[in-house]
Swiss-Prot record:
It comes from Rhizobium meliloti (strain 1021). L-ornithine binds at residues 161, 221, 225-226. GO terms for molecular function: amino acid binding; ornithine carbamoyltransferase activity. Its EC number is 2.1.3.3. Belongs to the aspartate/ornithine carbamoyltransferase superfamily. OTCase family. InterPro entries: Asp/Orn_carbamoyltranf_P-bd, Asp/Orn_carbamoylTrfase, Asp/Orn_carbamoylTrfase_sf, Asp_carbamoyltransf_Asp/Orn-bd, Orn/put_carbamltrans, OTCase_ArgI. This is Ornithine carbamoyltransferase. It comes from the Bacteria. One of its GO terms (cellular component) is cytoplasm. It is found in: Cytoplasm. Reversibly catalyzes the transfer of the carbamoyl group from carbamoyl phosphate (CP) to the N(epsilon) atom of ornithine (ORN) to produce L-citrulline. Pfam families: OTCace, OTCace_N. GO terms for biological process: arginine biosynthetic process via ornithine; citrulline biosynthetic process; L-arginine biosynthetic process.
Length: 303
């Protein structure tokens, strides 16, 4: 059976834990110069319909560190789903490469790719979810604070794709998920309902202080995601959800701060917080590399 990595909800808790534990080992081996290359001779196709820095570099470097190679394919060059159906593209690519990573807008394009591909398909990001980011976040949290199970993670800001995957992660990893968003920016009900139906404790409010109270980790993201540049910046409904020193005082004394980057300093987070001692954003960015190496290895049967 082909191993896809599409969403945390599509994975078992056991498989996700296996990937996190493997990432920890691979990271240590990389630092020690003893890392193995289990994907030697393998080729990863990377399809980008949305631009990226971290996703492209981390998958490219990660695949190379595992001994494999990558092929970059831009959405404009491929005309995915226009000149050729996504299903046909998936079938053709499956004859050439050993895995496909796609970063796209419409989540349905990811699912259609996986439906027709005979090689693993990995979700590099869609407008709905961003599971690779949450794997990096869990790895980072546990490096600094130990097991995430039973801890409280708080989100403040927009109800976007990263939050959707954090919500799914709460059911799979066993952490409590608090979130505060402005009216009209709530996460999609299907993610909340799925998490609650799978045993997660999730709290949705519109008060940042309420969500952050006692939290072990505070997470935010840009208020303006790609394709949302029409929304006003700065002085808008998101201002009360800014992560600043005053808000962090409501969290646990040793709470971590996370942000998937890029950050708009002075908007969703202040310099005081992102550059402060509680911030682990650059560890988090590095761990995209290590978490995704283990996702790649798991998908291709090397874990």
């Amino acid at each position: 059976m082909t191993r896809h990595f599409l969403d945390l909800s599509a994975m078992t808790a056991t498989d996700l834990r296996t990937i996190i534990d493997d990432a920890r080992v691979r990271k240590s081996a990389t630092k020690a110069g003893t890392a193995e290359k289990p994907l030697a001779g393998k080729m990863l196709a990377m399809i980008f319909e949305k631009p990226s820095t971290r996703t492209r570099v981390s998958f490219d470097v990660g695949m190379r560190q595992l001994g494999g190679e990558t092929l970059f394919l831009s959405g404009t060059e491929m005309q995915l789903g226009r000149a050729e159906t996504i299903g046909d593209t998936a079938k053709v690519l499956s004859r050439y490469v050993d895995a496909i990573m796609i970063r796209t807008t419409d989540h349905r394009r990811l699912l259609e790719m996986a439906e027709h591909a005979t090689v693993p398909v990995i979700n590099g990001l869609t407008d709905d979810t961003h599971p690779c980011q949450i794997m990096a976040d869990i790895l980072t949290f546990e490096e600094h604070r130990g097991p995430v199970k039973g801890k409280t993670i708080a989100w403040t800001g927009d109800g976007n794709n990263v939050l959707h995957s954090l919500i799914e992660g709460s059911a799979r990893f066993g952490y409590r998920m608090n979130m505060a968003v402005p009216l009209g920016s709530e996460p999609h009900d299907k993610f909340l309902n799925w998490a609650r139906n799978n045993g997660a404790e999730v709290l949705l409010s519109h008060e940042a202080e309420q969500a952050v109270a006692g939290a072990h980790c505070v997470v935010t993201d840009t208020w303006i995601s790609m394709n949302q540049e029409h929304r006003a910046r700065g002085h808008n409904v998101f201002q009360p959800y800014q992560v600043n020193g005053a808000l962090m005082k409501h969290a646990a004394p040793d709470a971590l701060f996370m942000h998937c980057l890029p950050a708009h300093r002075g908007e969703e987070v202040t310099d005081e917080v992102i550059d402060g001692p509680q911030s682990v954003v650059f560890d988090e960015a590095e761990n995209r590399l290590h978490a995704q190496k283990s996702i790649l290895a798991w998908c291709m049967g090397a874990v």
